Amino acid sequence: MGFSLIASAAILAVTLFMAVEIITGALLPTLDGINTSYGELKNRINDQLQTHINITTVSRSANGGNYNYNISVQNTGSVTLKTEKFAVLVNGVAYPASCSCAYIYPQNIGYFTLTNITSGGATRIKIISDNGIADYYMYTP
């Protein structure tokens, strides 16, 4: 009876050791990934809190039956914004826009150009930055 008790205790100890090894081997990388994701989330929230944009002027010129828009956007926050990730909506429809610069640094202005836009009359314009902060402008000719 003494040998079987020692053998069963050894088997249980080895099984427990293997179970702990499997659990920690799978759990530690997951916890590291969660920690990294949480750090990225904090950085993104911090960037959103420090991002402010303002549409300063909008001008429109006729291009045949369509219109070209020139929109100036000022970065009034403290985060540098990447303009290639901006979205420009005219009356709720996204249009491709080109910008005069790759980045809008704090307290600087970027100039966006939209060509061949079909909407005339009063126009609602929305600019969305790369981290989701937006500004609205109502253009009336």
Language-model regions, residue ranges each:
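C-terminal juxtamembrane segment of a hydrophobic transmembrane alpha-helix
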Residues: 10-39
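N-terminal export/assembly leader peptides and their processing motifs that target proteins to secretory
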Residues: 29-141
